[in-house]
Amino acid sequence: MLQYPHINPVALQLGPIKIHWYGLMYLLGIFAGWYLTRYRAKVKPWAPIKPEQVGDLTFYVALGVILGGRIGYIIFYNLPYYFHNPSQMFFLWDGGMSFHGGFIGVLIAFALFARKIGANFFDLGEFIAPVIPIGLGAGRIGNFINGELWGKVTDSPLGMVFPTGGPLPRYPSQLFEFFFEGVVLFSVLWLVTIKKRPRYLVLGLFMFLYGCARFICEFFRQPDPQYGYIFFNWMTMGQILSIPMILLGAVILIAVFIKTRKNKCENI
């Protein structure tokens, strides 16, 4: 059995002001995304934005992630609770962010920013997709430090006892998601971007691979108590929300494949 490290969720306290690791992980993901996006804007001839525009894009994306992630969590996962406790909506440091809500928020941010600078929405998505897993991975580390979103009870050597998860060992599902949705997904997408490839291949891969990784990791994660299993006595809300991403990613990949076969797909 693994030992849970018991990290204080508060990284730094300055008088009454508490700086939480959860928030720092989001800041780390946003900063890393800004840095790599700026680098890509300098070296990629087809980049839909200029390096000096990356700061503004990062601001739009950060708002989309935070607002979309929080609103998505409230709507998708715990609406009755927040309806009766509206002040809790603003306590982001306690956790409670939805990737799928954040993804919708980012899509809206992309649409607004693309319209502002006159860029193509899908080109912008293709350009940003390789750096998104960094933020996903950082967020999962924040979940792990918070001791939330732990996995199912297990007798596996990978199990650990979480402070809020009862006395039995559980899968560290946050670390599984960090590895597959963060490390593996980033590595795959970044390697694909090194060489020329069909336009929108990376966008399709991101949506398809993330959806598959999340769907599989949900089998190790404890279902949300307010929902449990929604369909077939095994399907969770996270899996339901991942299915549209898998399907849309598959559609994009099939379209790219067909255009490539017909020599109608531009390589970038």
Swiss-Prot record:
PROSITE patterns: LGT
UniProt pathway annotation: Protein modification; lipoprotein biosynthesis (diacylglyceryl transfer)
Principal EC category: transferase
Gene: lgt
One Gene Ontology molecular-function label: phosphatidylglycerol-prolipoprotein diacylglyceryl transferase activity
Pfam families assigned: LGT (PF01790)
GO cellular component, one term: plasma membrane
Keyword terms, alphabetized: Cell inner membrane, Cell membrane, Membrane, Transferase, Transmembrane, Transmembrane helix
Family of the protein in this entry: Belongs to the Lgt family.
GO BP of this protein: lipoprotein biosynthetic process
Protein name in the entry: Phosphatidylglycerol--prolipoprotein diacylglyceryl transferase
Keyword rRNA processing appears in the UniProt entry: no
Organism domain of life: Bacteria
Organism: Francisella tularensis subsp. mediasiatica (strain FSC147)
EC numbers on record: 2.5.1.145
Compartment annotation: Cell inner membrane
Residues noted as binding a 1,2-diacyl-sn-glycero-3-phospho-(1'-sn-glycerol) in the record, renumbered to the chain: 140
Function statement: Catalyzes the transfer of the diacylglyceryl group from phosphatidylglycerol to the sulfhydryl group of the N-terminal cysteine of a prolipoprotein, the first step in the formation of mature lipoproteins.
Regions that span the bilayer: 14-34, 57-77, 90-110, 117-137, 174-194, 200-220, 238-258
Membrane topology recorded in Swiss-Prot or TrEMBL: Multi-pass membrane protein
Main location: membrane
